[in-house]
Amino acid sequence: GKPNRPRPAPIQPRPPHPRL
């Protein structure tokens, strides 16, 4: 069997930065 390729970490949504 083919070795499983390590999938990249899932992209997490950035927390909304406070608008100054």
Curated annotation (Swiss-Prot):
Gene Ontology CC entries for this record: extracellular space
Residue intervals passing through the bilayer: none
Subcellular location: Secreted
Keywords: Antibiotic, Antimicrobial, Immunity, Innate immunity, Secreted
Keyword Secreted: yes
GO biological process, one term: innate immune response
Predominant location: secreted
Ranges for region Disordered: 1-20
Protein family per UniProt: Belongs to the apidaecin family.
Function field: Antimicrobial peptide active against many Gram-negative enterobacterial and plant-associated bacterial species. Not active against other bacterial species like H.pylori, P.mirabilis, B.pertussis or N.gonorrhoeae.
Record-given protein name: Apidaecin 1+
Species of provenance: Pimpla disparis
